[in-house]
């Protein structure tokens, strides 16, 4: 009888140990609290590829700003990019086009298992409600500094 109790106790400990380990391996995908930024005004035109921008240093920020600054508007020669503390933050951006009636939702999640930040933008087009005047946006978002070992991905989906 004592042997059976010991055997059942060991089985219980093994089951608890295994079930606890499974919980630790599940993907944790918290949504971050982020700051969405407006586009940087008429003096900066970011002609972006589908890959998006991941800006994590002031030198890269200034370089990209310089490459995308236009000079054909009044006062653009003296305008500067907003100040961002890249020791604490990373700036993400990807270009989308929407009309004034489209619905847009954005979020940034962290997948701790694959070590990846994912910036998701969902667009629902309501073509029948609006003229087709397109508003182009870079969807800038400021997030806490992305750790070195993490990657960043962008997911943009559009539905009618």
Regions picked out by a protein language model, each given a short descriptive name:
Residues 20-160:
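Exposed, flexible binding/inhibitory loops of compact, secreted disulfide-stabilized domains
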């Amino acid at each position: 009888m004592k042997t059976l109790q010991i055997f059942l106790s060991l089985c219980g400990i093994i089951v608890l140990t295994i079930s606890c380990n499974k919980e630790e391996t599940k993907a944790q995908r918290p949504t971050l609290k982020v700051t969405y930024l407006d586009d940087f005004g008429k003096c900066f035109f970011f002609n972006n590829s589908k890959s998006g921008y991941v800006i994590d240093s002031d030198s890269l920020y200034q370089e990209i700003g310089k490459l995308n600054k236009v000079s054909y508007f009044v006062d653009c020669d003296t305008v500067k990019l907003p100040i961002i503390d890249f020791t604490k933050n990373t700036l993400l951006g990807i270009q989308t086009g929407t009309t004034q009636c489209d619905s847009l939702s954005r979020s940034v999640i962290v997948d701790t298992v694959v070590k990846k930040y994912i910036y998701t933008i969902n667009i629902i087009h309501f073509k029948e409600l609006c003229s087709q005047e397109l508003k182009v946006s870079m969807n800038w978002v400021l997030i806490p500094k992305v750790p070195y070992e993490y990657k960043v991905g962008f997911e943009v989906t559009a539905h009618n």
